[in-house]
A protein has these predicted regions:
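Terminal leader/tail segments of proteins
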Residues: 1-98
Length: 98
């Protein structure tokens, strides 16, 4: 039985797989990886909070674009300001994921 599964993320516009953006499924939860860097972690346990890497979560526009998809932020609410508000409200935790 596999304990880790890696899937390439798909473009929301075309539905085609995109290079260098991955979801990594583990027993503990799902990681979002952009290129070779872990950006975010969503635990399977609903009591656990979303964790973002404190150094890389907003590394580039592309990283943010796929981070929004990973955490299911709809197009109307996609802004760095909204994520910063969630961090300030302690709904998202910044930590070292790398």
């Amino acid at each position: 039985m596999k304990t880790i599964q890696v899937n390439q993320m798909c473009s929301p516009r075309t539905g085609n797989p995109v290079a260098n953006q991955f979801k990594i499924y583990t027993k503990k939860g799902v990681y979002f990886q952009s290129y070779s860097t872990i950006i975010a972690f969503k635990p399977h346990d609903f009591k656990g909070k979303l964790k973002l890497d404190e150094s890389y979560w907003d590394y580039s526009r592309t990283t943010l674009k796929y981070l929004y998809d990973f955490i299911n932020i709809n197009h109307r609410h996609r802004s760095k300001k909204n994520i910063l508000k969630l961090i300030q409200d302690k709904q998202i935790i910044l930590t070292n994921l790398n």
